[in-house]
Amino acid sequence: KELKYIRLVAKQTSAYTTVVKAAADAVTQQAPYPTPNPLADQLKIVARLIKGGLKTKIYQVNYGSFDTHSLQTTTTDPTAGSHATLLKNVSDAIKAFQDDLKFLQIEDRVMGMTFSEFGRRIKSNSSTGTDHGAAAPMFLFGKNVVSKIWGDNPAIPANVNVNDNIPMQYDFRSVYASMM
């Protein structure tokens, strides 16, 4: 019974591979993307598959290395370091993706969202990093997304310590539901 199921899944996967390849091959020109940028590489494929006619409703791409318990910033400049580089790569990749969607004339059909499975603490630890926290920002983007900041700036106490968290203002599941 299990082997029959595995064979069925393998057959379906093989058939769907043909559909995915046809969608990818249907697009011969795209707007430029930054390199090297692993997130941009993935978003370029997503734009290609959407324009190529793949009917997938939700695509998920991943970009790691945000688990910055140490060396998140430089010791002399909190706006420089590995975290700043990560955020620049995200920004550059999303900008290229949006430019490509416009070039491909499909920007009206796509909405994007960033999310993380964990937030960060308010205050840096002794290793110039931050530990896991409760809340995290989410960014929604796309031509039809209303440009607005939701939520209030949190009050951060003067005596904040490395164990303090920012409380969540919105349940991430409600944001997911709104996107659907």
What are these model-predicted stretches?
Residues 1-104, 123, 137-180:
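Feature for exported/extracytoplasmic and membrane-associated proteins, marking the mature portion
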Residues 119-127:
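Basic/polar, cationic surfaces and motifs that engage anionic cell-wall
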Residues 134:
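Glycine-rich and small/hydrophobic secondary-structure elements
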